[in-house]
Amino acid sequence: FSDMYFFFGGMVPAILESGIKCNLSRGLTVFDDSDYTDLPAYRDNVRLRGEWNGANNGRLIGDLCIHGEYTSNPKIVEAVAQHARETGARIQIHLSETQTEHEECKGRHGLTPAAYMEKHGIFDSPTTAAHCVWLEDEDFDILKRHGVTVACCPASNLKLASGYANVPKMLESGINV
């Protein structure tokens, strides 16, 4: 499973004991002009990767994370992308989860969330994008071109009444789901 949240420390012992395969990350949100290396999520993910990355015969992987476009800024997105390139880390993000998120990103940046993440280098590293409910045609091409893996979250999407991912089109496009 993949998880990005705030309290991974309590999860690690259970993950190790169960032997389950897991990509784990401390969620990153920022609403100001903070430097990436000053954020608690940066420190937590560096610690996670330093202490646990590759544990259980490689079954526990420490990823980097950007919660989403609307909970970050270009400076942070680019810093996470650079950190991933420098360390070989994978990245987890939420992408086009709701119509509001998707349309507001287009209003702010003139780009869909997928195009925005591509522009800022996130997809230069192996990436798992959660949700992907409101993708546009160009977004399928972006995800395929960069080998992005989509993690569908139907229970979450139903809870938010945000719709459901077009998995058949993803598969037809050659996207790993």
Model region roles, listed by residue range:
Residues Y5-V133:
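Metal-coordinating catalytic core of metallo-dependent amide/deamination hydrolases
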